[in-house]
Amino acid sequence: MSSSLKIASTQEARQYFDTDRVVVDAVGSDFTDVGAVIAMDYETDVIDAADATKFGIPVFAVTKDAQAISADELKKIFHIIDLENKFDATVNAREIETAVNNYEDSILPPFFKSLKEYVSRGLIQFDCPGHQGGQYYRKHPAGREFYDFFGETVFRADLCNADVALGDLLIHEGPAVAAEKHAARVYNADKTYFVLGGSSNANNTVTSALVSNGDLVLFDRNNHKSVYNSALAMAGGRPVYLQTNRNPYGFIGGIYDSDFDEKKIRELAAKVDPERAKWKRPFRLAVIQLGTYDGTIYNAHEVVKRIGHLCDYIEFDSAWVGYEQFIPMMRNSSPLLIDDLGPEDPGIIVVQSVHKQQAGFSQTSQIHKKDSHIKGQLRYCDHKHFNNSFNLFMSTSPFYPMYAALDVNAAMQEGEAGRKLWHDLLITTIEARKKLIKAGSMFRPFVPPVVNGKKWEDGDTEDMANNIDYWRFEKGAKWHAYEGYGDNQYYVDPNKFMLTTPGINPETGDYEDFGVPATIVANYLRDHGIIPEKSDLNSILFLMTPAETPAKMNNLITQLLQLQRLIEEDAPLKQVLPSIYAANEERYNGYTIRELCQELHDFYKNNNTFTYQKRLFLREFFPEQGMLPYEARQEFIRNHNKLVPLNKIEGEIALEGALPYPPGVFCVAPGEKWSETAVKYFTILQDGINNFPGFAPEIQGVYFKQEGDKVVAYGEVYDAEVAKNDDRYNN
């Protein structure tokens, strides 16, 4: 396997070795593409910089006096080239080349290493995929453009499992299982499964392995639609819902502290199944969002302590996190770092959507299983059973580059180097928040305003990256406006860069006279080349990963400050939102930016939008269950459905779940009756589409028809008359 690693050398040290490799200047290098560093012994800045990466790069120090090198520097040096003795540039070259090869061998994880070796062999293919290394694409102009756009390597790495050299990804053997075992060690799991198809596929795998028809499932109402669909609609689990928070800004909060009370949970379970509610462990599975889309992250140790004894298994859906165990102050949020699990505790499953904020191609995810402490018990799900479900959803034609991305991700998180990546990110984003707070007044980072008697922005950055006090949701604090949080229950995920926009009084949580709805901010940023993750009401979210740099964050801050100035000056809308204005000039002709802000803010205010959004996830306002989600799914498959307009849908049983996307959380689940609250909320969305073209959200499970000059929303509901007269199922 040929190596592409370079050698980083200072100018003075370059004369003391020969090499056929590319040599780059060690000064200013980030050392990610080099296999060795060569410097004079007194060039300690270079030696220290290489050591600070924690990559373990071999450093060669050239010296005329080996005795003069300090003990501290010796710890950072791999080998000394001693000029006191007669040096031989060729010998030095061999030593350096050996070190580079050994280093590369150590940094490449098992599957990716094997994939590189396999591709380098240039085998003649007569198997799948049909493009056979990209050669088919090269025979047509469109195909050639496609081939050239992605580059040769990705096509040559798109392989078929007809050759078992890389191991079978479905039965977990060879380099494939070696990669999963390596990831399990990195993440502190008993077993790890690499999943293609996103965390939706991972959730399908977990729930189909654990939930059978009729099982009780303790269910976080914030769960992603994939969990509703797989655990309830497909597997037949019966939900016991836990109510969750929304605040006036539109941020998604965690489960109410009171809902973790055992007595209350058993009372809720008794309404679904009085007998099972009395069992030692009423629930086959609990599914909890470890971190919400909007950065409320749980103390996982407390969750297990409070509800673990009621459940055979707990699945922590960690789609929006996964990095918590690599950040010291977040360790308590990692279910995989609970080290005192015993036979009475639940099995732990953690699903991670690696592609969201870790290093993975889109659709890469992984399942971590930590349940050896219940091995031998009837509730234990062994590998055979779990892999049976894995194979139900895993393609027999996996995309090997995606699998390799999961392998490389684990390598990147490992050890000191991985922890440093996340620490450096924290420093970058803390500094960015400070700059925005000090330079602007309109868009406020969603963090505590005061910590330990000092303004948040006046804290010491290094301390803030290690002290959870700066991120804690204090019980009852006005700044976050979440109700029902307990002491030390939740904190802000520091890797969610969340901003609030004007329009909500932070003291009362009420609407103010003027506001800037976040969708306006999001559209402005997109017009200026910056893509946020999502926005809702008066909140906007940016996902932070180790990809961020100070320059990148400064570009974001600059555009936010520019928008603030434009709003303060009441600039023409045509100047502020050119794309939306051009597409809807008849509607917005002559508008200024403040006029649009005012109209949209008043629309949300007059409809009391955040109140209805909040109620959707409160037990008092949960839709009544008309049939089980599994039954609703069966009725929909049988075509026992009818399309009903929103203004006539209240009380009808939904056969499809309805939700805005993002965040992908059902407001009405399959089998639930459309409630007054749900109808009102989706009516607000419908009216927003009609009144403010260009700002339409993506909505799933609700269908829109153009009727005259208006868009009208419809939903698929149960048609009892059709079901009654369907002779296929009434014999």
Swiss-Prot record:
UniProt keyword annotations, A-Z: Decarboxylase, Lyase, Pyridoxal phosphate
A single cellular component GO annotation: cytosol
Modification N6-(pyridoxal phosphate)lysine occurs at: K356
Pfam families: OKR_DC_1, OKR_DC_1_C, OKR_DC_1_N
Broad EC category: lyase
Cofactor(s) annotated in UniProt: pyridoxal 5'-phosphate
Protein name from the UniProt record: Inducible ornithine decarboxylase
CDD domains assigned: Orn_deC_like
